[in-house]
Curated annotation (Swiss-Prot):
Induction per the UniProt record: Expressed in the early phase of the viral replicative cycle.
Annotated Pfam families: ABC1
Protein name per Swiss-Prot or TrEMBL: Putative ABC transporter A445L
InterPro entries from the UniProt entry: ABC1_dom, Kinase-like_dom_sf, UbiB_kinase
GO cellular component, one term: membrane
Family label: Belongs to the protein kinase superfamily. ADCK protein kinase family.
One GO BP: membrane lipid biosynthetic process
Species for this entry: Paramecium bursaria Chlorella virus 1
Alphabetical list of SUPFAM superfamilies matching this protein: Protein kinase-like (PK-like)
Amino acid sequence: MNKQLTNNGFRLTQRGLQIGKYMYRTYQNVKRIQKGGPDSFKAAEDFVKDTSEIGVIAVKMSQFLSARSDIVDERTLKVIERLQSEVPPEKESPPDFTFYEWYKEPIASASIATVYKGKRKTDNSDVILKRVRPEVKQRIMEDLPLFIIVLDIAKFFGVPGAENMLEIVRECQPVLLGELNLKLEAKAMSLFKKKFASIPWLTIPTVYEAGETYMISEYVPSKKITAAYPNEMLARRLFELYIYMTIDIGLVHADPHAGNIGIKKDGTFVLYDFGAIIDVRDAKQYIAKCLKSVVIGDTDGVVRSLEDMGVIKSGGSVARLKKAIPKIKKIMESEDFNVELSKLPEFTSNENRIFELTTRYIYLIRSLTIVEGIISYHDRDFSLTKYIKKYNDIIDDIVEVPAIDIVKEIAGDFLTTPASLKNMNDLVFSMKDEISTEIADAKKIARYGFAMFLLIEIIKML
């Protein structure tokens, strides 16, 4: 038993050193990318190669960074975008199923799962198999604590950017854990299909069967929304879709990058990948009020809505928020809403922030930021204020909904939702408990590991 613990400790120490070196190399590569010039191309290749090799958490961290223009510059963002399409495919063949057969080569490969196309033998229809990569759960459970420890150490020593990176790791933790169970994704996908059945220009593939590590669904071909020629109709539809998600239905697709939003030849939207869903049903009324208040310039209304949402840090922040609202309204009318917003210290500076954002609001902001970028591609004159005004009727309807009706709606959804989806929070929290245990164990060897790392680096410099 002691020997096993020693071996495990040694293995985790080695992995921790590997992650520490990766973080150091990434820090150096990002600085080279930011400088530009010929050396930046080599740095970009090194960054993508190192991130792909270190594993799923590094890839996910990088993808989360792509929505944080307050942390990462434009050059680095373009490099990070490559990680959505340059994840090496797994080498194992797809599993055998009695009623299905699969092509050996995957049609898509992500950090957590691989997607194969195949045929259903009963009717020869095209289907899709999504499968969690082998051993990815074990890798996540081991690496998350080590990333946190390495970044904690870097933060302690005042390494630039360590605090923001630590924040990113903590942000992506719930999504990572939720994406490990494809049975939960299948239930969420079916729930979305039911909720959005009334939208004629939206398709959500039908799920045929699912288990914890696999999901088989309808094959719906399309092209990426950003592969379509810029079209204002697509911009309006995407905005309308996310307005409905956020303030009407209250369930929001949390990973709306271009690969997960397809366009069919007739202009119909196709949504893929429901591994991460944001539930804001209990807050959608306040979000609607906040949007309306911003548009009409009601500063007190904005503050009240944000207080109802529980996102203002303290009483002292309210006065600063009121001063910032005119700036925010002006920024909402600009073409580069996200870029300009990221320049306000009230949103970005660790010392001056006025918001205490919970995980779901962080994901909501991230999702809407990505959507904003896609909308701006299709409508160069995009203005958030202008678009919101077109949906005043929807916003007014939500603002007037009594709180008891929202409670009834959530309760109704809960009662008709399969047990496996109801237990999603329990699953995530149990995994977080496992990770907390891993962190406690890893901290015991952190000092030794970090000392060894410093010693090795000093020897290399001599």
